[in-house]
């Protein structure tokens, strides 16, 4: 496969479910919510009591289990917890590599939003933050370019989360077919 430059464009990214009145166990991996509608396994947990990139691993009724323990030392009640669903904006083709050259994330909303970009290493089964909790003001964009180039191996993914439903448009510049 010959190397080729392309753009991966994804419109209106942002899947967000929030519950107020949630309870977070002390240094634990459970969150109790009033309902679990709209929450999915692999959703990112967005709350001050969890480290960046914490994911939902299991849902049993109104109990949500996470892959990382909370940082609070005592149970925290009356918490607002957001669950951000992933949008896969690019997948590297099988048997080849791709390179993320840069990207533009554009705010679609009438207020500020926060965005998260992660890489999914398919062969290792690991997610890593490329951008975490970055604010984009109303009427603005964020550019990914100064951090160097990100190599994506076969079937690796670029996933984007936004704290606002349909809040961001994505345009990634990709060099694909790299051997």
Q: Where would I find each of the regions flagged by the language model?
A:
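Small/polar beta-strand repeat architecture
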Residues: 16-85
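C-terminal interaction-tip segments
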Residues: 1-15, 84-108, 161-179
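Intrinsically disordered, low-complexity Pro/Gly/Ser/Thr-rich segments with frequent PxxP/GP/PP motifs
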Residues: 123-157
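Short, charged beta-turn/beta-strand-edge "cap" motif at the junction between a beta-strand
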Residues: 49-54, 148-151, 164-166
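Beta-strand signatures of extracellular beta-sandwich domains
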Residues: 44, 116-120, 171-173
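Extracellular and analogous surface-interaction loops
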Residues: 34-37, 88-97, 150-152
